[in-house]
Structure formats: structure tokens, C-alpha cells
């Protein structure tokens, strides 16, 4: 974007940024993300606060959001090149990490910002810098949570500046195409493995039902899971 902006008038750049950030913000809101701040043409987004759908669903929402952002930019290419005189196609890169961070009001005694801080944020920022144009790059922490929903390229190791250790990361290829039979199999496997499902198991089960249910019964099942998370599941004979 920096190289492109040098070839375009400042007023047109301002108009483009307003257009672009509006488009990306709408997608963020659609998938339940919290916009922390705009940094030039970049957006910092986090999940898990002020509301969370659980680790698995939050991570999945974030990757779904990233994919839709990429798809939206691709669809807007003809309009962008015509409306804003861009000499080349615009591509965005996205870095995603999962980890603990501090969220709250930080700043001086005269001015506070609601923001997230911590090493997990820094790693996500570095992954964005390491990503290729048009790539969604996720850390291993994120991949572990969402690998049932997406396909990834082979593992690669990066050494992000400012991070004291190498980071294993993966490029998101696309969303897995799961048929109804495989979804039922995954849900059944969760149920029969242990009647005392963990929170992560419940998150995974809810995510599967919510996304892939093809009739109203799926919605009812999902609602039932939300209302009775601690109820044991019996295996009828």
C-alpha cells in the first residue's frame, strides 16, 4: 500500500482509506470481532472481550473473518482500480495469533484507550509482517483450535523481530468442505469418547452444529447445548 500511495494524490488516498476501512469494519462486526484501533491502512482486531463464544468459536470466527476480508478485496478489485486509479491489484495480508493478553483502559491520567496489550498481540503483528500479499498466516496456537474447519499449508518457522523464540506458523488454504455425514461423525465421536465433555469439546460441538446444521433441528440442538453445558450425555442402548 505504501508504494501505491506514493503514486496517488493525498485526497484520493484519504477517500480510499475511508472506503476500505468501512468495508473491513463491516466484516469485523459481522464475525463478532472488536476493533482495537486503526493504524494507517492496518486494523488491529481482537476476540474474547467484551464477549466470547469460547476459544474454538472465537478463533474460528477470526479466521472466517480474515478469509471473507480477502474475498471481499478480490471482489472489489475492478471498482478499486476504476474509482481510485490504483495501478495494480490491491492485496492484503493478515496475521492471527491466539494467547493471553491484558484488555482494559490504558493510558495517561488525562486520556485512556480501551485496548489489548501483551506478547500474543506482538506475535500477531509480526506474523502479519511475515505474511505474503494475499495471505492469512496463523500461529500454531490458532491452528490447533481451528484445524477441524480449515486446510493449511505445510508448517514453516519464522523468526519475528522482537519475539525471543521461533514461531511455527501456517498459511490458511481454504475452509474445509465437510459433508453432513462427516459432521455427524465428528459430533458422535465427541459424545461417545467421554460423557463428561470438556469446555473445549462443547465449544467444538457447538461450532459444528451452528455452522453446518441444515434444518431447524440443528438450531434447537445448539441452543440445548448452550443451556445445559454440564449435563452428562448418555449412550442409549
Where on the chain are the PLM-derived regions?
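Catalytic core regions of nucleotide second-messenger enzymes
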Residues: 31-32, 36-39, 70-95, 157-158, ...
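A short glycine-enriched loop-to-beta-strand structural element that forms part of the catalytic core
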Residues: 46, 87-104
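Catalytic/regulatory signature loops of cyclic-dinucleotide turnover enzymes
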Residues: 97-98, 106, 119-140
Amino acid at each position: 500500500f505504501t508504494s501505491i500511495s506514493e503514486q496517488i494524490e493525498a485526497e484520493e488516498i484519504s477517500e480510499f482509506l475511508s472506503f476500505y476501512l468501512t468495508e473491513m469494519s463491516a466484516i469485523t462486526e459481522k464475525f463478532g470481532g472488536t476493533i482495537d484501533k486503526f493504524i494507517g491502512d492496518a486494523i488491529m482486531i481482537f476476540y474474547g472481550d467484551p464477549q466470547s463464544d469460547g476459544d474454538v468459536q472465537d478463533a474460528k470466527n477470526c479466521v472466517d473473518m480474515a478469509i471473507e476480508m480477502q474475498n471481499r478485496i478480490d471482489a472489489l478489485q475492478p471498482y478499486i482500480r476504476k474509482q481510485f486509479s490504483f495501478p495494480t491489484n490491491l492485496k492484503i495480508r493478515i496475521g492471527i495469533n491466539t494467547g493471553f493478553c491484558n484488555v482494559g483502559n490504558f493510558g495517561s491520567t488525562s486520556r485512556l484507550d480501551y485496548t489489548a496489550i501483551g506478547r500474543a498481540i506482538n506475535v500477531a503483528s509480526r506474523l502479519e509482517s511475515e505474511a505474503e500479499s494475499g495471505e492469512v498466516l496463523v500461529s500454531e496456537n490458532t491452528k490447533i483450535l481451528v484445524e477441524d474447519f480449515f486446510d493449511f499449508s505445510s508448517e514453516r518457522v519464522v523468526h519475528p523481530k522482537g519475539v525471543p523464540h521461533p514461531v511455527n506458523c501456517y498459511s490458511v488454504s481454504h475452509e474445509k468442505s465437510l459433508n453432513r455425514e462427516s459432521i455427524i461423525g465428528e459430533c458422535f465421536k465427541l459424545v461417545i469418547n467421554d460423557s463428561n465433555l470438556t469446555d473445549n469439546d462443547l465449544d467444538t460441538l457447538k461450532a459444528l452444529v451452528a455452522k453446518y446444521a441444515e434444518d431447524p433441528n440443528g438450531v434447537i440442538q445448539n441452543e440445548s447445548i448452550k443451556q445445559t453445558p454440564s449435563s452428562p450425555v448418555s449412550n442409549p442402548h
